[in-house]
Amino acid sequence: MKRGLFIVLEGIDGSGKTTQARLLARWFEDNGFKVVLTKEPTDTEFGKIIRKLVLEGSIIDGGRISLEAEALLFAADRAEHVKKIIEPALREGKVVISDRYFYSSLAYQWARGLNLEWLIEINKFAPHPDIAILLDIPPREGIKRIKKRSSQTEFDKLFKLQEKVRENYIKLAKMFDEIKIIDATKSVEEVHREIISSIKEIWGKNYGSR
């Protein structure tokens, strides 16, 4: 049995990752493939802790945790994700589509001041995907899409972070050959077609006729 195909979708908030992941999963299923659609943070216990951190501003039991501890929690969740979901599915020849992966940790936590080399080191265990689609969109458009403009102060704070994260994603695309940048300002249908085209390009190179 051939190893499955591992695809990751990345991008700043509001770039359309979840929508495109679902469309991609449906496309593979319509073409006769078994698909595992997954995400990070996951639904494991580590993932639940991380979701709580995101919602409550990195506070556990009334105390704010360090950025380093937060990064290690993300890595722990990812380790569970790899061992319990990603690797077993790939061994079974399935197509694995992940909405976010370790690139998110690198882009976001680097933007918050952590050392990139250290972030790469603590995520070294994570296998690289066959292709990582980076849905690129200007921060203002992304924020507009997720409707987080309740106040100018909140908008300005979010904009500055997303702007830095976007810059980091572009830098990461130059570091990791598997990252393919796609303009996510286009229509949902156009973006979907470009994703399919990008996947077909690496499909033949890595797998031959499937």
UniProtKB/Swiss-Prot annotation:
EC number of the protein: 2.7.4.9
A molecular-function term among this protein's GO annotations: ATP binding
A Pfam family matched in the record: Thymidylate_kin
Protein's GO biological process: dTDP biosynthetic process; dTTP biosynthetic process; dUDP biosynthetic process
Binding, ATP: 11-18
PROSITE patterns: THYMIDYLATE_KINASE
Annotated Gene3D superfamilies: P-loop containing nucleotide triphosphate hydrolases (3.40.50.300)
Reaction(s) catalysed (UniProt annotation): dTMP + ATP = dTDP + ADP
GO CC aspect terms: cytoplasm
Class of the enzyme per the UniProt entry, highest EC level: transferase
Keywords from the named record: ATP-binding, Kinase, Nucleotide biosynthesis, Nucleotide-binding, Transferase
Similarity remark: Belongs to the thymidylate kinase family.
Protein name: Probable thymidylate kinase
Species of provenance: Pyrococcus furiosus (strain ATCC 43587 / DSM 3638 / JCM 8422 / Vc1)
